Design a protein with these regions (language model features):
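Acidic, glycine/proline-rich low-complexity segments that act as flexible tails and inter-domain linkers
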Residues: 1-44, 56-58, 62
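Glycine-rich anion-binding loops and their surrounding alpha/beta cores
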Residues: 12-27, 82-89, 94-190
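Alpha-helix N-cap/helix-start motif
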Residues: 13, 44, 73-74, 184
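Generic signal for short, ordered secondary-structure residues
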Residues: 34, 59-60, 78, 139, ...
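A cross-domain feature marking catalytic cores of carbohydrate-active enzymes
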Residues: 37, 66, 110
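Acidic, glycine-rich active-site loops and adjacent beta-strand->loop/helix elements
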Residues: 39-41, 68-72, 178-179
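Short secondary-structure boundary/capping elements
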Residues: 43-47, 127-130
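A glycine-rich phosphate/pyrophosphate-binding beta-strand-loop-alpha-helix module
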Residues: 46-95, 100
Length: 190
């Protein structure tokens, strides 16, 4: 937790992500877009899901990963996708089959990396987010050519950008997303 208070450097984030990716041994599944969804929505509905699904309907293979329940009073992607008619994947094989069928698949952190899933759930116990909240957005487990990450606190933008660069991500976009998810604030000015 001291690392979180001090704030992780981009080098530390890149090292955490590299170690995680080495541990995962994720299969080689072709995806165009890695979309992380870890924050949950507090003020608005997760409209970004509609954008991801429209991309999928138009031939873009979107892999979304995230976590739910770690922060109270949030609406998480895992809760909304079934309401939109999209089942949550539980294995890499399901991810591959679903991507081949509809170009969109979601896999939770609990499913693809249970140790990090357990740590992220300690948020309410410890009273603050852990470095896992930061590094999970950068994992890009299927090594997509393009990665989307949202941060809530602008101070994290630079560390995410530099970590992505150190990880060799060619096309990585980091924005201050509404509620920490990858979408602009619908109430904000353009």
């Amino acid at each position: 937790m001291l690392l979180r208070v001090k704030e992780e450097s981009s080098e530390e984030l890149a090292a955490f992500v590299t170690a995680t990716r080495d541990w995962l041994h994720a299969p080689q599944i072709a995806v165009d877009l890695d979309w992380s969804s870890y924050a949950g929505k507090r003020k608005h509905y997760p409209w970004f899901l509609l954008a991801a699904l429209v991309l999928a309907e138009n031939g873009v293979r979107v892999f979304m990963h995230g976590a739910s329940g770690h922060t109270i009073n949030r609406l998480y992607t895992e809760e909304v996708l079934p309401e939109l008619g999209h089942a949550l994947c539980e294995t890499w094989q399901e991810v591959e089959n679903t991507l081949n069928r509809v170009n969109f698949a979601y896999l939770s952190l609990d499913a693809y990396c249970p140790p990090l899933g357990n740590i992220i759930q300690l948020r309410n116990v410890l009273g603050l987010r852990s470095p896992v909240h930061t590094l999970s957005r950068l994992i890009n487990p299927l090594n997509a050519q393009c990665s989307l990450q949202a941060i809530f606190h602008p101070a994290y933008r630079e560390s995410h950008q530099f970590a992505a660069q150190q990880l060799g991500y060619q096309n990585s976009m980091v924005i201050k997303g509404e509620g920490g998810e990858f979408e602009r604030n619908p109430d904000g000015r353009c």
